[in-house]
A protein has these predicted regions:
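A conserved acidic beta->alpha catalytic loop
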Residues: 37-47, 64, 94-95
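Active-site-adjacent helix/loop segment of glycosyltransferases
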Residues: 201-285
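A short, conserved alpha-helix in the catalytic core of glycosyltransferases
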Residues: 165, 171, 175-176, 181-211
Length: 327
């Protein structure tokens, strides 16, 4: 039975032919589905009109790529207008387990302080690797902990990706929604950290599972070393590097365990890119340009400040946080 108290918000950007099957799976678990499309071309619009127009599905066509943050905020505003208090946010290529919404909702209903919950997040299974990702939470002093979310337990965590998360719409309205000038990358992390500065909690629900694709990950062997790079395009390296600067400035001292993790993770994924990915020169230029623009406070859509030598990557409609310290 679908949960009529939950509205799904799916952000699309040139959805692939397998999207309708995932849409059907989501629709069976929620009361309504809102699709917010960032594609901005006739082919994608025709595809969605042919597969997504049903009684319980509504499509918002943005006409261009407004970024994942703006798309999520538009979806959240529409869900509130429809009377919903909770929304399930999803990327177009994420696939929930059959009981994911039921598991998230059950924990929400049993929580002693539901009014303090900003997000309930499922266990993330990386579809390309077939293994669970780890969460981040504070350890001793400034150290961080990277627990696996196993069994039926729940735990408070520092960050969660937007895809698969049950989003409290009252909390979303309370502290201003997702940061649209980030466009993409760190959108979910910034929202989680800001929520906690306002007294809200981020809760991981280990019984709920989401199968999620992080970039175009595949195994690369370098002698005895096995790496799993994401193969993001230069434009993603630009926004990652640019948005990291205001994140560290605003949250580094408040969340020292996150800052330590961020420093290590950023160094690792850059080294991994240099070792195992193509277009290294273009990506290094994008990192330098993004860092410079971040220092100058130049945010917004990346095309306004940086031209990607390789064009726009196909994953540009997403905002993955992922698990960068996972080889």
């Amino acid at each position: 039975m679908p949960n009529v108290q939950v509205c799904a918000i799916i952000v699309t950007y040139h959805p692939d032919p397998s999207f309708p099957a995932r849409l059907e799976k989501v629709g069976r678990q929620v009361g309504r589905v809102l699709i917010v499309d960032n594609s901005g071309n006739n082919r994608a619009i025709a595809f969605l009109k042919g597969h997504a127009h049903k009684d319980d599905v509504e499509v918002i066509y943005n006409g261009r790529n407004l970024g994942v943050a703006a798309a999520l905020n538009l979806g959240a505003a529409r869900a509130r207008d429809l009377g919903f208090e909770w929304a399930l946010t999803l990327d177009q290529d994420s696939e929930p387990s059959e009981d994911m919404v039921r598991c998230l909702w059950s924990v929400l209903q049993g929580d002693p302080r539901p009014e303090t919950l900003a997000i309930l997040a499922p266990q993330i299974i990386e579809a390309s690797l077939g293994r669970p990702a780890r969460f981040l939470r504070a350890g001793r002093a400034v150290l961080f902990d990277r627990p696996l979310c196993d069994g039926g337990r729940t735990m408070e965590v520092t960050t969660a990706i937007t895809s698969g998360s049950l989003l409290g719409l009252r909390a979303h309205s309370d502290f201003g929604g997702f940061r649209e000038d980030f466009f993409m990358d760190y959108v979910d992390t910034e929202y989680c950290l800001r929520a906690q500065t306002r007294g809200y909690r981020i809760l991981a629900v280990c019984s709920a599972k989401l199968y999620h694709r992080l970039g175009d990950r595949k195994e690369i062997s370098l002698g005895p070393l096995r790496l799993y790079p994401t193969f993001y395009g230069p434009d993603r390296w630009y926004t990652l590097s640019r948005n990291r600067i205001p994140m560290v400035r605003r949250y580094g001292l408040r969340f020292p365990h996150w800052l330590l993790y961020e420093v290590l993770a950023s160094a690792f994924i850059t080294a991994r890119m240099l070792l195992a990915e193509p277009q290294r020169r273009a990506k290094v230029k994008a990192i330098l340009r993004g860092t410079w623009d971040g220092l100058l406070g130049r945010l917004g859509p990346p095309d306004a400040f940086a031209e990607s030598p390789a064009g726009i990557s196909e994953d540009r409609g997403h905002a993955d946080s992922g698990d960068p310290l996972d080889l």
